[in-house]
Amino acid sequence: MSTQPTKTSSTKLRIFKWLFIISTLVAIAIPITRLLMHLYGKIDEKMYARIFMSYRVNSADSFMINGRYKAIKAKAYPTSEERNKFNSIAQEGDKAVLLKYPYPEHFSLEPEWHYTLCDDVFYNLWKIRVNVCEYYKNNKQEDIAGLVTPPKEAKVDRFFRQDPKISDDDYKKLFTGTDENGKGWSSAAVQFIDILLNLINKPEECKLKDGKLNEKFQKDLESLVSQLGYSTEDMKNIANEIPNFFIQFGKAFPTVIHSTVYSRFYYFFLFLTINGNFDFSEVEKTDGMKIEEFNKQTMKVMASVFAQIFAKVYEESYNYEIKDAGFMDKVRAYFSVSDNIDNVKDQTKNINTVKEVLIKNKELLSK
């Protein structure tokens, strides 16, 4: 009796097994290679802005906008002084900031461990957040054509929106009475506005080159962070970390602390520009679209506006690309981080509006 069919079947099975093993190894090797390239590979600094914008628009910005806090059972995790303090502010009593005010909250870690990234400086920003939400609550949003009106029982009239009609007095009230000992976000508002205006008007004086920031820009950032309330001892470490903050974002590989700091400044940027009349025409309204969804989309637009201002710190603009790339350049590009900017919409018009709004608001907050 012939055994040829059995041999053929056995050979096919071995070939299939080897193909499966090889394809599995390749599937594992590619992401590992990309991670190693990400960690240790050299990325052209001229590509930082492009990589940064790709990272923000295609993934990172959504985490700042879609995050919502849910109460954590007090006995579910070991207690500590830091966790107890966080819980008392975030979720306990009538003034539970993260529960009573459904404003977006960015979680670089799981919500259960969010407290490890919070300190008194971050808690101070929440005071402005409360003022903003209370303002929304007392000043209902007008209907937007084609959108569903929010329910009357809503605790807050939708978690975010621009309000060009806010009075100067109401705008100032968002920031007053939130700082202690002359330190905090409100006290640092004018400094932050100056930094944003410098990035918009004089980006050549704010550049990151060869791993270092322009000396004056570095000092301006140190002064801003100090004004937020960090101690002299803290500032020694923070000052050294500031250039790395921008470098890691240029590589799309920030630490959880970097990401948390970025989102705090983004929220602060939103609060400071709440009275701007921005262009949200890129947000497509659909039948039955709820107001909260529309506002979420406008928040994404503002995230892109903020990111494009932030990206001015880098040597080249975000639409820079390496011309006449050689074979090895293409290999490095394949295994490196994404630089796909197809979803990035130019925000020059809105950045010009930011400039006008901040000049006005600087004067208001300086009085």
Swiss-Prot record:
Protein function: Involved in adherence of spores to the host cell surface and in infection efficiency.
Top-level taxon: Eukaryota
Listed name of the protein: Spore wall protein 9
BP-aspect Gene Ontology terms: cell adhesion
Keywords, comma-separated and alphabetical: Cell adhesion, Cytoplasm, Signal
Subcellular location: Cytoplasm; Spore wall; Spore polar tube
GO cellular component: cytoplasm; polar tube; spore wall
Complex and partners: Interacts with SWP7.
Residues of the signal peptide: 1-29
Membrane-spanning parts: none
Location (main, coarse): cytoplasm
